[in-house]
Each structure stands twice: as structure tokens, then as C-alpha cells.
Amino acid sequence: MSFLKEIQRRRTFGIISHPDAGKTTLTEKLLLFGGAIQEAGAVKNNKIKKGATSDFMEIERQRGISVSTSVLAFNYKGKKINILDTPGHKDFAEDTFRTLTAVDSVIVVIDVAKGVEEQTEKLVSVCRMRHIPIIVFINKLDREGKDAFDLMDEVEQKLGLNVTPLSFPIGMGYDFQGIYNIWEQNINLFSGDSRKNIEDTIAFSDIESPELEKIIGEKPAVKLRDELELISEVYPAFDRDQYLAGNLQPIFFGSALNNFGVRELLDCFVEIAPAPRAKESETRLVKPEEEKMAGFVFKIHANMDPKHRDRLAFVKIVSGTFERNKPYMHVRLNKNLKFSSPNAFFAEKKEIVDISYPGDIVGLHDTGNFKIGDTLTEGEIMSFKGIPSFSPEHFRYINNADPLKAKQLDKGIDQLMDEGVAQLFTLEMNNRKIIGTVGALQYEVIQYRLEHEYGAKCSYENFPVHKACWVKPKDAKSEEFKEFKRIKQKFLAHDKYDQLVFLADSEFTIQMTQSKFPTVTLFFTSEFE
């Protein structure tokens, strides 16, 4: 197959949602329809616990939540699908934000009963900033939930999206009968039996036909016709160019646990979703069809195999082909590296690949060369924009609980921070270490991993901080900046890359500081424009 055809075949996307909206279930069902797994590992209800394929760290298995982004790939209808399954747990946002830098489009999963939740709002706003095409999947229709129109309004208002339904539910919860597929013009009847892999579809192009009454009953038929008429009047018709530009978001309804509505989503997705897109580097726009390879590290995962102390750097290929055993330039370190066993993924199963194309995610064994945001090229000096650190929301001092293991603790903290699990700030005054996370559960994860992977114990103390602000003075030698440093010295720290950070204890402090020191600018992400 030609290089251009290989690029056109690829679809790399992320699935994002609030905890428990059914994201991992949806991921598994997509794999099931893609023929990549024989049966989905039950995400609840199954008597035999198979363990979901995409949750593969020990702590995820124990708690039944996805903690780190895993990469899954399969072929479907001649397309190569790469899914980045992001942690939906409210405490794993940092990793999730970064995953969004590596996807070409996104599917947002929303729980029909809970509607839009705040976690989803944050993630979708990042997608909108980047103009990433979005498809919305409203899940769990076999349960009682909000009215479909109310949900669509909520999605439009809270997420700032402009939606158009491509499928619509017939009834809901107890009365749920199935879905009318607007995109393909057919009806899917719901049987409630998840063992049936593919549900029965009835082709149905003329919604006015009296056949409809026979299939779903008189009242539901009248209601469905009214609803579809309303949809055609109120919502815009689907336009692929608008979708690709990030201005229009199609909505699908279904129940992932019951395999319902998932195939329609997948069929439409492979048809409309974008192939790998060009990406902005700091110097120029890099297009996928360029001959020379360029890629960037968006995630580092330590100890994927507890038996070996290995780290894997996940690299998204942006242009050219990545070949095994060919030397590539590590831009930040300015040295050439060769990779004898680049991995492709299928959750925990890794396979060595000889050649990868734009849109693919490759795992490279790493002995400590990589940090998040690093670039690999064939010699060109460039780095990709948009892999920032966000200000954490929780801050705690980290203390060593076992004096004999100080070295292991330092190494563990270092590696976990490289992975981007949390952020480390070192206070200027006394060099005490503060760990900042996006959610409180992260502290447990760090403690657990330090102990189980590095043999080090730690304890925490609260540290009252509202936000971390990265500091950039207009003139580092000015009297004003010196005064700022003198007054705020207790709250000044350095992040891992030695950038100066001001740990503010309230929104009021931030405002006061900004008005008192106008030439000292404060940023809430570590990547300044």
C-alpha cells in the first residue's frame, strides 16, 4: 500500500468522559466490533470477572477505574483505528489533557442520567481550543434518564457545542425500544441481550410509512415522527466540513454495555472522522505526508511490566515513517538514538513493529532519555506546541517516611514526575518538596506506586495553595521583580524544569499581586505564548 494510502487509512481518536459514564465499556465494545477481542471484559454485571482489556495497571484492576491512558489499535472496514483510552476518573486530568495533544478527533461519552459533568466541560474546552472534531455518544439509554432534547440543550449550553443528532432514541429507560438511525435511515430494535453481538436493523427510509406502527406501536410511532420533524426544523443538517473544522458535533444515542448503538457510531465514525492532521511546531506546520519523520512524546509510562524496571515513551508520529533500527535525532538532547524494538499496542500486549505511519502511536523503551513533549526528527530542529502543564488543584508536602530509602524515594518521585503523574515544586526557602495534582486520588496512586515499584514510603502534609502561577517578569533585574521576590519568598518555588512558580493561597492574592506588580506576569499553564 502506498504511503499516502496508509495515512488515509488511519483514524486516531480519544474517548473522554466523566467517571462511570461508560467510557471503558465503549472502548471494549468498539474493539469487539472491530474483531480485536472475542468478548468484552466485564465492566460490572458479569459473573466472570475478565478484567477490562484497557485497564492494565495493578491499581486500576483493584479499583475498577482507568488510571492511565492506554493505547489500543484494531482494523475495521479497511481503516486502522487507534484509540487512546483516557482516564475518566476525576483525578487523572493531567494525563488526559496531554492525550488530547495526540488525537485527531474525539468521542465524548455522556451518561443519560447524569448529563454533562464538570470534568467533561474541562476536557471539551481543551478540544474546542484546539478545534478537534468531536462526536458525542449519549450512553446508558436502557436506564431512566433525562429527556433527549433536554440533554442536547445541556450539551450545547454547558459544552458550548453546536450539535446535530444522527440517531435518536425511541422511548427511554423502561420504555426504551430502540433507536432510529438518522444517518443511515434505519431502525434498530433493542432486545436488552448483550450476548447478541450485532442487533437487528430494519431499513426504514420512509418514516411516514404505516409499517412504523406495526413495529414500535401507535403512540411511540406518532411521538417519533413528531420528534424527527422537530429535529429537522431545529438542528442543522450534518455537514462534514463543519464537523472537521470543529464547528458542528454529531450526537449518537445508545447503550454500550448492551452493545447497542455502538456499531452505528463506529460505522459513521470511520466514514466521517479525519485522517491524521497537520500539527503546528514552533517553527512551521508539519504535514503528515512529508517524507521525513517527526513525532513527539505525549506520555511516559514507567514499569508497565513490574518484573522489569522499564519505561515506555509513547510517541505520536506526525509525519513520515518511523522505522525500526533507523537513527533519529532527539532534539532536546541533540543526539541520535536508534530503537531496536519499537512497540505497537493492544493494551497490555505489545508487538514489535518495523514501520509506523503518521497517526500511529509507537512505544519506545526508554532508559531516562525522554520527557513529555520531547521531539524526534530526522535532523530538523523543532518542537511541537501545545503540551503544557496546567496548574494543579491540590498541593501537599511530601515527606520521606523511611530514612534508609531516601535514594529510592528521590528516584521514584523523579520517574513519576517524568511520567507526568503529578507536578513537583521545590520551595526556594528550604528546598522542601511539594507535589501538586489535579485530583486527590493521585496522592494514593503515587504512594502506592512508590511503595510497590520503588520500595520507598512517603507521607504527606497539607499545604494551603489555591493555584500555581508560573512567573515571567518583564525585566528580571528590575527593582519591582526583586521586591516581588522579597515579599513572596515563602511562596516561591521552582518546577521540574526550573521555572519560577508562585504558589498563591487565594484568588484574591493573585489579583492583589497582579495589581501591585504590573510588570510581573502570572500564567496558569507552564507553556507561555
Name each region found by the language model.
Residues M1-E529:
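Structural and coupling elements of P-loop NTPases
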